[in-house]
């Protein structure tokens, strides 16, 4: 198929509010992708990710070779590049490099990587093998699957069946959770000015749904779920909820999920390396058997020559009659 390229320019890099940042989505090889970067300790980590990971059909796999490049805008020769080959599937939805470039080198004045507070990243993707189909065209905006949205209603339950907790009408099943939240974060809604009870209930449902998401196991949370959680958090902050504590928890979960995905990707890479190594060992063993057979044949030939030589040595000496 050959390489196809996507260029990502990260603007205002030095003033990013989050450790995590995503590129726009792009389509290569009939699949929608995006790039994810995050500042991990002393490095910028960079990964290629499947954008529609939660809606992939069963059996979907792509064997992909790709190159990630942090472009040096002063000299192409100084650009930082990493190349990877790996399978993407329903379990492994990202692959890349945790130590793409050191933050010291990236932020260096006149280093060429950060110019006008912009970082330029290029990914070149070559889909080598395709298993399963995913109908995504260059012009399509999304896979034809409904987007998951955090519910903003109360599932049709009437206000008469709700209970007031700190000025919020909540369901009986939500009372204990809401009380506990306000006990630990009493100032959470002090600046929340909405008077409409439907709006207030909607905001509380968003908050509870977000907390439910964060309480799931890492195996059950998808990358898409975390993307929806980020949107929910922005909605709450825009509504003047004080949810810094929740933002920190979301960052922790995102980091753990990223580590889990990186671990899966690394395991797959090691499995591929082990497979290649075992094949090499098998080839060496086969060659060794051939050499052993050659050695055995030579030993047999040597024994024959020894027998001939011994027989010749034991022959009686010639007599005068034999000579004359």
Curated annotation (Swiss-Prot):
Residues 3-125 form the MATH domain. It comes from the Eukaryota. CDD domains: MATH. Pfam families: MATH_2. Keywords: Coiled coil. Residues 241-309 form a coiled coil. This is MATH domain and coiled-coil domain-containing protein At3g44790. It comes from Arabidopsis thaliana (Mouse-ear cress).
